[in-house]
Structure formats: C-alpha cells, structure tokens
Amino acid sequence: MCYVRMTPEEMAPIGRERTTKEWLDIGRDAVKEGLAFLLLTGGEPMLRPDFAEIYLGLTQMGLSISINSNGCLIGEKIRALFRQYPPALINITLYGTSRESYGGLCGVPGAYDQVVDNILWLKSQGITVNLNSTITPSNLNDLESIYEFARQHNLPMRPTLYAFPPVRRSNKAEFSRLDAETVGKLIAKDMLLQNGPETIQDMVSKFGTAEAVSPGCGMEQGERMACFAGRSQFWISWDGSMTACGMLCEPIAKPFEIGFRAAWDEIVKKTAAITLCPDCTDCQHKGICTICAAVTSAETGRFDGKPEYMCAVTQNYHDELIKLAKQ
C-alpha cells in the first residue's frame, strides 16, 4: 500500500509478504478455476526483487497481465523483460508535470524525468499505456498540464478526483483531500473534456425524469452490489488476504490457508449479502452517483451508511453539469 512504511518488526504482528512460489502457486490455482485477466499492483509492484520472476511465471500461464505502476522503476532489467513479454496494459500514475511537483508531492524531484522517459519508452515498444492521476490539494494546479501531457502524447488519462478515506490509517494521521464542491466541479469538467458538450447536454436532458422520483424510498434495506466485485473479480493483498475489491476491507477469505476455490466461494457468498444505503435506492441523483459498497464502508464504517461527502460531491457534479450544458 502506498502510504504504509513499516520495518520488518512492525510488520510481523500484522502479516507477511508471500513468497515467489506462493504467488505462482495461487496464480496456477486461479487459472485452473478460469482466471484470464490479472492486474499486478501495489503500492509499487516492481519494488519486489522477484517481480520479474513472478511476472514471467504468470505470463507463461497464459494470463493477460496489466500493471499499475508509478513508472519510476522500469530500468534495463524490466525493459528487457517487457521487450520479450510485453504486458497487455500498463497504467502509469502521473502526479504532476514538473520536477517541482514531484518534489512537493512525492519528495523525489528527479522521479518526474524518469517517469516521462519510461512512458515514452513504453510507447516506443508498442505497449499500451494509460495515465492515471490522483488529484489532491498538493497537485491540483497541475491538473490542466496533466491533461495537456496526455493530449500531446495521445494517451488516455483518468484522474482520480474522489479520494477514499484511508480506513487503515492511524486515528492521528491527517487526511488531505479536495472539498466536495471542488471534486464535483472537476468531475463535470473531466466529463466535458473526455466526452464533449453533446454528452453533457444529453445527460442533462435526462435529469427531469430522474428528478421526478420522490426522494426517500421508505425501504428498510438498500440495493445489492452491482459491480463485478465478488462476482467475476477478486483481490489478493500483499499478505494473502482475498477480498472482493481492492477498496474493501471486508469480507475477507484466506486462499493460502483454505485454498483458492474455497476462498472464492466464501467471498461470493458474503459479497452477495451486502446491501447499500436505503436512501440511495430512489435518490434523484442515482443515475450520476458513483456510490458503491467501498465508498459507504470507507466513509461511514458500514455498507448501508449514508456517505454525506459523496452526496455533496454528486450534488455539485449535477449542478455543474447543468451550468456546462447551458454554455
């Protein structure tokens, strides 16, 4: 995880990283059960000294592999590996567009030059690159230039504007994210930049029907999860715990202890029982809200809680879309 730095002594009571063999064994078991597409992520997956061995082994199992990376560690060894066994996709997180931005947010000014060089190298090899960018108060001023970088290099760019509260943080730790009004406006702006004014106008033209629904559904139970999590998607963390999604802390199964199939069956069963906030069922903004079990859990500590911050984000998103449609 990006925000965790522990000594081996601090990590011992919590869990341990799984070995090369363990990862390859669980990968083999997952392939037998039908796994075809795999994402390797972290933190930074290339920090593991055995990354190349794990990646090669999984690739040779026939998996289509994507990678999430900050783009700093694609040195000669990794380049040689990718030349022979290119990933299906690599998502690079771009934190800014200058040495100053990387110095301020990441503490490593020179990382910016490394990241740009590696992005250009990946493109030169015909490897599909997507740009991600996590926007915080520290790099908000870089957002326009990140879009411009993506346009110049003909790269898809997806900004992460909603920041999950890090539920595993210390209670004393500060949590820095944009206010709901700013996030809502930025999501609308991203929709405009990515899809054009016609899409905005089409979305707004449908608001009338949705808003005719009376708020408050009167139900005691909310809707079930509607995403792929726990249906055709799972996540295994650094210590070997399986969840339905990387942003969920529960339910948890232990595939390295009970076997992959048993763990998957457990996740499917428990995920199917999750219900969301009843107030969301007939909310007038349901069609544009990105509410999910991970959001409600992180924001409220329960799956059926009402995430007021996300409600405010969506209201501001809605209002900004209307303004953009009139321009």
Give a label for each model feature.
Residues 1-89, 190, 324:
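Conserved alpha-helical substructure of the radical SAM core
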Residues 2-5, 105, 255, 295:
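Residue-level signal for well-ordered alpha-helical positions
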Residues 8-17, 104-110, 174, 298-299:
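Short glycine-enriched, charge-decorated loop/helix-capping segments at active-site entrances
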Residues 18, 49, 110, 138-141, ...:
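Residue-level signal for the nucleotide or nucleotide-sugar donor/cofactor binding architecture
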Residues 45, 73, 135-137, 250:
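Short histidine/acidic/glycine/proline-rich micro-motifs that form metal-
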Residues 83, 88, 93-229, 235-243, ...:
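Radical SAM enzyme [4Fe-4S]-AdoMet core and its adjacent flexible, acidic
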Residues 217, 221-224, 246-327:
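Flexible mid-to-C-terminal extensions adjoining Fe-S/redox cofactors in radical SAM and related proteins
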